Design a protein with these regions (language model features):
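A beta-strand edge to alpha-helix "cap/lid" segment located at domain peripheries
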Residues: 1-12, 74-152
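Short, low-complexity N-terminal intrinsically disordered segments enriched in polar/charged residues
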Residues: 1-42, 149-152
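Generic, low-specificity signal for short hydrophobic/alpha-helical stretches with a mild N-terminal bias
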Residues: 3-6, 18, 26, 51, ...
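A solvent-exposed, acidic/Ser-Thr-rich amphipathic alpha-helical stretch
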Residues: 14, 33, 37-94, 99
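Preference for short coil/turn "hinge" residues that link or interrupt alpha-helices
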Residues: 30-32, 56, 116, 121
């Protein structure tokens, strides 16, 4: 690629990141399972400590493919208490300009503490291919009881 092509590719990727950043947040807040799934590739992988807290048969915390994601989003939407996430973000996100999109739901929100986590996504072909969610100390404390029930 020449310099102009690199600039265009970076601009296109930035547009994809902007779209995913806004649409993922809005669709998750609205519990829009089909809308969320449309942001993921058919064979996407999602890893989160919330997975075994929601799905008893997924104790490794890893979901593979849209059908497993669908089950998690549907059940998670049904079981999500209002206080779990306040959905406050600073509006800032990070990217390497090629494949990564990262943002934070910080613990300290304007109206008090919220679940603290970081969304880390690998984007391929305009879709989320690999999504990892890292939970902070406040969030881990909230889901710890559900996680311990699946421990040996």
């Amino acid at each position: 690629m020449n310099g102009r092509q690199n600039e265009q590719a970076a601009s296109d990727f930035h547009a994809v990141c902007t779209r995913v950043f806004h649409e993922w947040h809005e669709r998750a807040r609205a519990r829009d399972t089909e809308g969320l799934l449309a942001l993921y590739s058919e064979d996407a992988i999602l890893e989160s400590p919330l997975v075994p807290a929601i799905l008893d048969d997924k104790q490794d915390g890893v979901l593979r493919g849209r059908e497993e994601l669908r089950r998690f989003f549907e059940e998670g939407g049904r079981r999500r208490p209002n206080e779990l996430v306040r959905w406050y973000r600073t509006g800032e996100w990070l990217t390497d300009g090629r494949r990564l999109l990262v943002w934070e739901y910080p613990r300290q929100a304007p109206d008090g503490d919220q679940v603290d986590l970081v969304e880390f996504m690998e984007i391929a072909g305009g879709l989320i291919a690999y999504h990892r969610v890292y939970w902070g100390w406040k969030g881990r404390r909230l889901i710890a009881p559900a996680l311990s029930r699946g421990s040996p």
